[in-house]
């Protein structure tokens, strides 16, 4: 086992604080509408230019192991805020730096670290409760666009396109961000339910110019097994032919004789038909087949519930206005499902999202929810170069997370004002002893840090602005982009309450742990590896007599 170096008390805390400050100083330069850029070297290709706090934090590794521990802990603050709300990483980093600096000063002055932590925790709980009171619902498109704009560093085009996407697919819809091919941002929306399985045979294509199979007013046969024997299907095919409607078959697979017969019938015009594999695998496939059944008002033909293909009738089939199949995807438009059944299925999936702890499962459930409730929107980010594309895409993703958070928990005045206004919640707050009171007081100073940093980045004097904002009330604050004071909500400067709350909770949680640190342990630096020299070979002098 490698030897370890241990640092105790102030010696360790000083090193840790140095690491905290290096990372936080690099990240906080990006905060606010006049935040500066950070350039990051890449091992290949052009350097990355970014104003995204979490991208900066991820790149920082320090040579000194003890300083690096401090930097990594603050990086964890940014990651926690990002995981919880998807944005607010820079605010969380600025808050953590302020709390750690103030806290370690108090520890050096002889305060009890555990009581300081309890004071910080009390004040955090009170401020979070006040932020919830300050928050206002965010439902209209204009407010959503404003939140997106602020999060994307005052880029109106990003805020507007996110608001438009949310309006089209509702708050439950899936919005994905991709790299575009032009200079302008583009939005495309997929109507209805789309899943990533295409036609099983190109002979189903009936629109050769666009290479798609399009079925108008089709019936849908949903089968939870492989179909290889055409005889099983004859009764249902005859019934569909009599009804004179097209048929879409969604099954685990359609192969051999069954597929060949369907193709021949389709080409001869006896039954207009197309077949596609069911999406997903295993239990997820069964769930997605059931989703399609609910959406189209059909029944999944499954032996588990005592249904077989031979006994299938038209009553078991789903209905839709139109189905479009291409090589990769199938889209079902305007399914004829009963609204109450669809709503019930949606609430069931929401419940599963709340119960699962797996990020992968959560993502897949969110996709299913979107397909049932709203649809899927794709934002294609346009830019003039690859470097700009990466930077812009990161900002669009941040803005998207921020707008989702705003819809979820409402909005508060932006620009660091909400945290300053929430100070009234801890005006009369008292701890159990003097050291806890110091913990409460240091958080009171620390929550001003984001406003101070925004002002500093815009080239103004932080103390003057903070005093003037404190003298005001309600939504009164400072617009760093224009240098004006006024109502932040009216000026369109909004922050999602969830982002501000998550940033404060993540910062005070990690900072409290750092304040209560008494010992730090790290591997001893390997001097030989650093020198890279060859070992001493002096003992080989007696080899001269060898032949």
Swiss-Prot record:
Top EC class for this record: isomerase
One biological process term in Gene Ontology: protein refolding
Keyword Chaperone in record: yes
Catalyzed reactions per annotation: ATP + H2O + a folded polypeptide = ADP + phosphate + an unfolded polypeptide
Positions of ATP binding: 30-33, 51, 87-91, 415, 479-481, 495
EC number, as in UniProt: 5.6.1.7
Domain of life, source organism: Bacteria
Any Gene Ontology CC annotation: cytoplasm
UniProt key word Isomerase: yes
Subcellular location field: Cytoplasm
Pfam families: Cpn60_TCP1
Keywords: ATP-binding, Chaperone, Cytoplasm, Isomerase, Nucleotide-binding
Primary residence: cytoplasm
A single GO molecular function term of this UniProt record: ATP binding
Quaternary context: Forms a cylinder of 14 subunits composed of two heptameric rings stacked back-to-back. Interacts with the co-chaperonin GroES.
Family: Belongs to the chaperonin (HSP60) family.
Function: Together with its co-chaperonin GroES, plays an essential role in assisting protein folding. The GroEL-GroES system forms a nano-cage that allows encapsulation of the non-native substrate proteins and provides a physical environment optimized to promote and accelerate protein folding.
Protein name: Chaperonin GroEL
Organism: Pseudomonas syringae pv. tomato (strain ATCC BAA-871 / DC3000)
Gene name of this polypeptide: groEL
